[in-house]
């Protein structure tokens, strides 16, 4: 039983080796003699179990041994290609810093410059700062109005108007302070006069009270004297 199993395994190995040789050629150092060596070792191992053995069928090696190297010689290895970065930077998650400088890709549409708006902040101001030109709020009017129709004297007129506004505010503050001081002095003078009159009036009332009280005291003394009974007259002889 063991001998039959061994013979079946040997035949299976030979058949597989033949199929591999016919399909892919004798490559990678594959040789049928290796299988024969293995079967001989197996035979020596199992000799003490049975005496009947079957002679293995030998397969003929290919006539031209150089054919197995033809396949290796004809194979060419290609260099792996490098992946290029996308030419459009917008493909990287759709994030690009240049979008901040473009009014056309805003969600609410491109902003139109308004006629009455002046001194606003626009994308052109950002471009001027990035390019090193500096921020010029007096030259560039709001809404990105940086065309050729800008007035070069608008900055001077704006500065003049600002200075005039500050000067008028200071003048009004000074006038208000002077008028407040004058009204305070007038009120203080009026209160001082009123206090003097009140003091004189109080003094006069005190004098009248003193004058009126003196005769009253004299009269009361006289009344007390007349109210006493006359002394008794001595008897006449």
Swiss-Prot record:
Pfam families: CD99L2 (PF12301). Residues 183-237 are cytoplasmic. Residues 47-157, 218-237 are annotated as: Disordered. Highly expressed in the nervous system, including brain, dentate nucleus of hippocampus, granular and Purkinje cells of cerebellum, brain stem nucleus and choroid plexus. Expressed in peripheral blood T- and B-cells and neutrophils (at protein level). Almost undetectable in bone marrow-derived neutrophils (at protein level). Also expressed in thymocytes (at protein level) with higher expression in cortical thymocytes than in medullary thymocytes. Expressed at high levels in testis (mostly in germ cells and Sertoli cells) and ovary (mostly in granulosa cells). Residues 51-66, 74-84 have a biased composition (Low complexity). O-glycosylated. Residues 102-111 have a biased composition (Basic and acidic residues). Residues 26-161 are extracellular. Its main location: membrane. Residues 218-227 have a biased composition (Polar residues). The chain crosses the membrane at residues 162-182. InterPro entries: CD99L2. Plays a role in a late step of leukocyte extravasation helping cells to overcome the endothelial basement membrane. Acts at the same site as, but independently of, PECAM1. Homophilic adhesion molecule, but these interactions may not be required for cell aggregation. This is CD99 antigen-like protein 2. It comes from Mus musculus (Mouse). The gene is Cd99l2.
